[in-house]
Amino acid sequence: MKMLACSAGRRMQFVVTFALAALFSGSCNASDPGSRERSFVKALELFDAATSANDYLASARELESILAEGFENGAVYYNLGNAYYRAGEFGRAILNYRKAKPYRPRDTYLEANLQQALAAAPGRLSEPAMPWWTHVLFWSDWFSHPTKVRLAANGMMLAAGFFLLTVVLRRDALLLLAIAALLGGSALGLEAWLSHLSRMNRGVITAETMAQKGTGRDYEAAFDQPLKDGAEFLILSQTADWTFGHFEGIGDGWVRNEFVAR
């Protein structure tokens, strides 16, 4: 089954999305938005002209350079996932598709490509249970992460405004509106924060390796089979050379950092 590719029109939509995000982003001051947009367009051109795994990796490197200074964008992550998938690096593809999800929660192309990468990954493990808060805070997939942050901030500002009006005008109805705005903003902010923490602790194996019971070559293997490309796991701790993680369905183990992407 072929990976769902972006049409020319959809690719142009990505460019526009990227340009707008870059203009309004304050997360990266060292690189100007124009430079990021040029790198993004160049990466798309490299992807379209690619005929080998190395060509797709060249596109991926161009996209990685955009993210190197902390900039985040759903279109960049999505296309980075596409480039790694075509290069045969399924673990990195899965990781970047998942990073794109909070920015494009209802993108059917993204979801289809993620599922295809998961199916192709030789090291795929059992899916962990959904966090409890995704059931309680049920709007988790309704809005993108930036939208949640903006709505949370607006809710807090509305709450402050209504509280001020309550003091000035002495009307109980305004107090109820203030409480509602405060609760709504707090709930959205909490969900955005929990989602961010969950993403920060996600890792994936990028090449076959044996997990160990400790941080040294003399320790026993943690599992009876090697971990392979695409094995996702929860990062529990990390040192300069090793990562300790929980691998769903098989247990906990240490792996060297060169086999881990996060």
Question: What are the language-model segments listed below?
Answer:
Residues 227-257:
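SH3/SH3-like beta-barrel superfamily modules
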Residues 184-210, 215-222, 246-262:
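Boundary regions of SH3-family modules and the immediately adjacent low-complexity/disordered segments
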Residues 123, 128-167:
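Membrane-embedded alpha-helical segments of integral membrane proteins
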